[in-house]
From Swiss-Prot:
Transmembrane annotation, as ranges: none
A GO molecular-function annotation: structural constituent of ribosome
GO biological process, one term: ribosomal large subunit assembly
Annotated family: Belongs to the bacterial ribosomal protein bL20 family.
Protein task: Binds directly to 23S ribosomal RNA and is necessary for the in vitro assembly process of the 50S ribosomal subunit. It is not involved in the protein synthesizing functions of that subunit.
GO cellular component, one term: ribonucleoprotein complex
Name the UniProt record assigns to this protein: Large ribosomal subunit protein bL20
Domain of life: Bacteria
Length: 118
């Protein structure tokens, strides 16, 4: 059985990993053994943070809605409850955009929520 030399495959694998590690600091972008660890960890962080991003954005939207609704004299939970009772089906992402960019419309939504709560 002939001897198998893996030079081509090894070089290709090394090149692939070092290309992924391009831009990393120091040995992480130059030394294969360190780069493998760095790229693996980066992949783990990316996987975790793709899931966290959804939570973080929802928190941001809720914070913005809360701040805007409190200016109009209504807490976030009472505002959302009022919208539900008034059968207004606008999700938090859109509510946050309205709160930031269209204050008049948001003030109208707060009034709708207040009427539904009364």
């Amino acid at each position: 059985m002939p001897r198998v030399k893996r030079g081509v495959q090894a070089r290709a694998r090394h090149k692939k990993v070092l290309k992924q590690a391009k831009g990393y600091y120091g040995a992480r972008s130059r030394v294969y053994r360190v780069a493998v660890q760095a790229v693996t960890k980066a992949g783990q962080y990316a996987y975790r943070d793709r899931r966290q991003r959804k939570r973080v954005f929802r928190q941001l939207w809720i914070t913005r809605i809360n701040a805007a609704s409190r200016i109009s004299g209504l807490s976030y939970s009472r505002f959302i409850n009022g919208l539900k009772k008034a059968s207004v089906e606008i999700d938090r992402k859109i509510l946050a955009d309205i709160a930031v960019f269209d204050k008049a419309t948001f003030a109208h939504l707060v009034e709708v929520a207040k009427k539904a709560l009364a």
